[in-house]
Amino acid sequence: MGTFLLLMAEASAVGGELAEGGAEGGFGLNTNILDTNLINLAIIITVLFVFGRKVLGNTLKTRRENIETAIKNAEQRAADAAKQLKEAQQKLEQAQAEAERIKKSAQDNAQTAGQAILAQAAVDIERLQEAGAADLNAELDRAIAQLRQRVVALALQKVESELQGGIADDAQKILIDRSIAQLGGEV
């Protein structure tokens, strides 16, 4: 601060000399570069110090507040992101557990359905076998009945042909004796 006052005092002295030179002969030009630079620097520094301190202070204060706000917002977003990540991980774990439960349930249902289909197939096969056996027995009974009818028809045809030709006396006597014996009589 003392240096600044010294510079101000020198600037005033130089300014006074310029004023005296201008009063003597009018407007004068100082050709001493070092003196003019010091005066210019002193004026600029004074203006900057007086007016710039407030502007610079306000700018720095605003910038600091903006940085603090940005840091707080970033920290808040980071905390929110961490919270959302934790929630998402919990939801993922729940979804994986649910998917595993659904998969196990589907496997159990598939196994149960497979067993039910196999059991139904076994019942259907047995029913078809029984139906086939019943059809086979019915066909066999029908074939036997047809054979009996045919045998009876052939036997009747033979008997008729023999009856038309007449029965021999010996065969007639044997037939009569046999019929009487069956009725319970004696010959």
From Swiss-Prot:
Q: What is this protein called?
A: ATP synthase subunit b
Keyword Protease attributed: no
Give yes or no: UniProt keyword Transferase. no
Keywords (alphabetical) are: ATP synthesis, CF(0), Hydrogen ion transport, Ion transport, Membrane, Thylakoid, Transmembrane, Transmembrane helix, Transport
According to its UniProt record, which protein family does this protein belong to?
Answer: Belongs to the ATPase B chain family.
Under the subunit heading, UniProt states: F-type ATPases have 2 components, F(1) - the catalytic core - and F(0) - the membrane proton channel. F(1) has five subunits: alpha(3), beta(3), gamma(1), delta(1), epsilon(1). F(0) has four main subunits: a(1), b(1), b'(1) and c(10-14). The alpha and beta chains form an alternating ring which encloses part of the gamma chain. F(1) is attached to F(0) by a central stalk formed by the gamma and epsilon chains, while a peripheral stalk is formed by the delta, b and b' chains.
Give the transmembrane region(s).
Answer: 32-52
The highest taxon in the source lineage is: Bacteria
UniProt GO cellular component terms: plasma membrane-derived thylakoid membrane; proton-transporting ATP synthase complex
Q: Which GO molecular function terms does the record list?
A: proton-transporting ATP synthase activity, rotational mechanism
**Places the protein is found:** Cellular thylakoid membrane
Q: How does it sit in the membrane?
A: Single-pass membrane protein
Encoding gene (name): atpF
Q: Which InterPro entries match?
A: ATP_synth_b/b'su_bac/chlpt
Q: What is the role of this chain?
A: F(1)F(0) ATP synthase produces ATP from ADP in the presence of a proton or sodium gradient. F-type ATPases consist of two structural domains, F(1) containing the extramembraneous catalytic core and F(0) containing the membrane proton channel, linked together by a central stalk and a peripheral stalk. During catalysis, ATP synthesis in the catalytic domain of F(1) is coupled via a rotary mechanism of the central stalk subunits to proton translocation.
